[in-house]
Each structure stands twice: as C-alpha cells, then as structure tokens.
Amino acid sequence: MATKSVSTFAIFFILVLAIFETPEIEAYDRKCLKEYGGDVGFSYCAPRIFPTFCDQNCRKNKGAKGGVCRWEENNAIGVKCLCNFCSEEPSDQTLSRI
C-alpha cells in the first residue's frame, strides 16, 4: 500500500514540474529565437550539411550565436530558419529528418 502512494506522489510531482517548466521554454523561444526573414527556410535548411546554411547565415549576417531550423509537422516544405541570439549550443537538426 505504501508503494502505491509513493508512486502516485512521484507521478504527481513529475507532472507538476513538467507544467511549471513549459512557460519557461516558450519564453526562451520568444526572447532568443527570431525568424531570419524572407522566404529562405527551405533553401537554408534542406541541404544536409553541418553547420546548416541557416546557422552560418544567422551568425554571419544577423550577429546571432547560431541558427535553428524548425520544420512544420504536416508539411515537409514548411520550414523556418530561426536565429538564436542566446545560445551557441549546436542542435541535432541535421540528423532529425533523414
């Protein structure tokens, strides 16, 4: 019986943490990620190279610390190049759509 209550408490605790962390992630995206601009998403993100053209051009032309490609879920061509002004951490985006 004690195991069941501990498990229930653990699940509840993890759920609460997940709910409270979500707004921070969204706030980070709004503050740090800005769209490159223009209709460059597919041409900057489609070539399978590292670093992507998105990352290279965000650094060179916009003064950002990096660039990230965000693909739309239902549309393979719908992609945006977002310049990251907060973090230089590279992403695994080049391997995510192979």
From Swiss-Prot:
Marked site, Reactive bond, at 48-49
| Signal peptide segment | 1-27
Keywords of this entry: Antimicrobial, Disulfide bond, Fungicide, Plant defense, Secreted, Signal
Q: GO CC terms for this protein?
A: extracellular region
* GO BP terms, alphabetized: defense response to fungus; killing of cells of another organism
Which GO MF term does the entry hold, naming one? sodium channel inhibitor activity
Q: Where does it live in the cell?
A: Secreted
Disulfide cross-links: 32-86, 45-69, 54-81, 58-83
- Report the protein name in the record: Defensin-like protein 192
Protein source organism: Arabidopsis thaliana (Mouse-ear cress)
Q: Lineage in the entry?
A: Eukaryota, Viridiplantae, Streptophyta, Embryophyta, Tracheophyta
